[in-house]
Design a protein with these regions (language model features):
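Conserved NTP-binding catalytic cores of kinases and kinase-like/nucleotidyltransferase enzymes
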Residues: 1-36, 145, 152, 165-170
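"Short basic amphipathic alpha-helical interaction patches in structured regions
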Residues: 1, 41, 54-57
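Short pocket-lining segment of the protein kinase catalytic domain that shapes the ATP-binding cleft
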Residues: 39-46
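Short glycine-rich loop/turn motifs
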Residues: 36-38, 149, 158-161
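Catalytic activation segment of kinase domains across protein kinase-like and atypical kinase folds
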Residues: 159-176
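Generic enzyme active-site microenvironment
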Residues: 40, 154, 172
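ATP-dependent phospho-/nucleotidyl transfer catalytic cores
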Residues: 48-154, 166
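Residues forming well-ordered secondary-structure scaffolds
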Residues: 6, 20, 36-39, 58-61, ...
Length: 176
């Protein structure tokens, strides 16, 4: 549920200060008790937006557009003192909702997923590492990331969370 809260807060609190291609939100709300949320945003079809297939291809112009938006996002918040103020609600590699999930039931959830999926088990075999080794490496990597300069990340950047606008532009959806 906290990912939904992050998305609501992005559109409500941060969207207006960024000059990037992402939908305009007209209203958003998150109910902490139920985990339910809602966002009323512009109808991107009114701008002839297309939604690419997650396994499809993008043009060089579209990729350049997306990378430009990500660079703008990262530069805007790079080492911002706001992370200790009005942005203290944002997660870091070693704090916040996803960290808390991983440190709580996360390892057991991953174990259950491995038990259910032969494909996922095969990935461990191909890596030549046990789950416990990878778990230790994950937390080592998280500590390294946490010691680096902070900025705001999209949180789930992949083709399925993008849209394409006429003229070679591309935008970002699904802010976690």
């Amino acid at each position: 549920a906290t990912m939904y809260q992050n998305e609501v807060r992005f559109y409500r609190d941060l969207r207006s200060e960024l000059d990037i291609e992402t939908p305009q939100a007209y209203a958003s709300s998150f109910d902490a008790a139920s985990g339910r949320f809602g966002i009323v945003m512009e109808d991107l079809r009114q701008r002839s937006a297309r939604f690419p297939n997650a396994t499809g291809a993008m043009s060089e112009a579209e990729i350049t557009s997306l990378l430009g938006h990500l660079a703008t996002l990262h530069a805007h918040f790079w080492e911002s003192p706001r992370f200790s103020g009005d942005l203290a609600w944002l997660w870091s590699p070693c704090s916040g909702g996803f960290h808390d999930f991983l440190r709580g039931p996360g390892l057991e959830v991953i174990r259950q997923q491995l038990e259910k999926s032969e494909y996922k088990r095969s990935l461990l075999v191909r890596l030549g590492r046990s789950l416990e080794e990878l778990w230790t490496l994950l937390w080592r990597a998280q500590a390294i990331l946490d010691s680096q300069p902070r900025t705001l990340l999209h949180g789930d950047t992949h083709l399925g969370n993008t849209y394409l606008v006429p003229g070679g532009g591309a935008g970002l959806l699904d802010w976690q």
